[in-house]
């Protein structure tokens, strides 16, 4: 069945390539239509209090609260008044406020409220607060800055606020991607050139995966928009995680070209042997990413869908498109062949075995402390942490905060015209030590003033849709313990007057709700990913002990990785914390499967080996595909860490890079010892012989999936010439005539 399918694909290779080319071009045309969202609060579950509050305010009021502060130096009062009119006249400015809206500028300012004056003016300039449309861009922010600098007398301008932060995030995504993706491509070309026997092999692999990446990004148009984090790391992670699929195919293709003189037959055999291996590996990674969709915080669903979809597209591209390209480009591939660059890993294997026992003891000793420590890590939840301190918007924020102090503006919506409760709440809010101002209908027009007699602009801004709006300004940071404590205080004060009939919203309020949701999501994602991958491994190996060994090694590596921020006493992005659970688990299980397959295959093909020899040879055989794939993942994510301008994305890159390194160390040092202990235990239970259920089936069913390129195909020629291999006839499991396979000496039966 599988062979007939593979043969049909190769026979219709031109149609397959044409189909992938058409889909890639169509997807490329859609990429520009995919919107990118940098506001994390938009991904809160619809039922959270802050999300409900935002929706209620959008329905009840035409205007939002201010989301931009503009500080202009060098202008006088009249010039500030003219600039306020310029801002108000802009079509993208929904509302504006300046000193003249709070004090009477026709009389000397020195005779008026000095606290109010200090809020809007200092010795060098004036502050303006604007409300602009949510779909703002960096170009829009720069246009507002240009208007300010064009004002007569203006010498400098600083712009901050949530709108400026979001625009800066979107701008940094595009700039970072222009650096990160070419760097990742270069990493793949260099690493694959070392791991293959032709300079064209990395290009073919990149073409296949590149098509999958373009199709994945373009197909995001179905979702309408993706988060800035997904946009930043999705393509690089898809490239890095799915590269081992191409390595498996190239391994089997190199082997098949030695085995069969007919190029078409070689491609068919390579496809047939690779499909089960790649499908199993892709399934593990797919479910690892899909576990993110169980998060209540919808950015998890966003990332999970995009990454899981990318794995499916990479699987299809590697198993269908890449064999066709290998066959069609076989002649130029042969002309660009080169000698093997990678050294023998026998010394590496001996070194791993030398430290195996101490490594196992250390892994067991640190497992519990690492598990506990990872849950004690401090997290950042706000999107402002996604901006580098050197970014213009952060520099401007520091300038404005230094002049006028940190300030967060929240909105409280309460039932309309319940003046007794509203006045009582306003009094309680004004009494808070962090409050800088409270604006309500009562403070602006007077609660005794009939709505019909009040200023129309005051009424429309503060009363609408059955709600009265209270604007609370507080001298707090965006995301710290003081801010979160204030959220609880204000909610309690509102509940005292209105019960559940109020709505509170603001950036910090959203981050508070994100924190609550994230705490639940951590457990959900871990359990979902663990159960999904455990089930796939159980089906694959049909033996509970092998998945248990694999998952223990990988989970310990994850616990160690995620506990490091706690021991370093640094805070980290909780999104990176959640993503690494799925990414490291999915990627590292691939490596574990390669080692497990190699070990089980050796045990079946050479039962005369001593356990120590088997473990050493398994490490030697699995080193090339594991280290090649992990090197691509580590170097690509290291590039993200070094070149991304987003601190949160940098943290994610470092977490994945460090996690892949830790996983490699545990796989090569701890896992072989656990397999040996498992064999000894089973041997004693069965009277000194036998193997677990499923071990034989797995070992026989995975042909060359993780044995590495040095042991097969053209790379094996060097070993064969040196007398390190021999041809052996292996009878097929179904009893059909034997075929000749090249078996390196260390793997051949003695």
Where are these regions (language model features)?
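Structured non-transmembrane domains adjacent to transmembrane bundles in polytopic membrane proteins
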Residues: 46-163, 376-546, 552-567, 571
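Membrane-embedded transmembrane helical bundles of large multi-pass transporters/channels
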Residues: 1-38, 136-379, 495-750
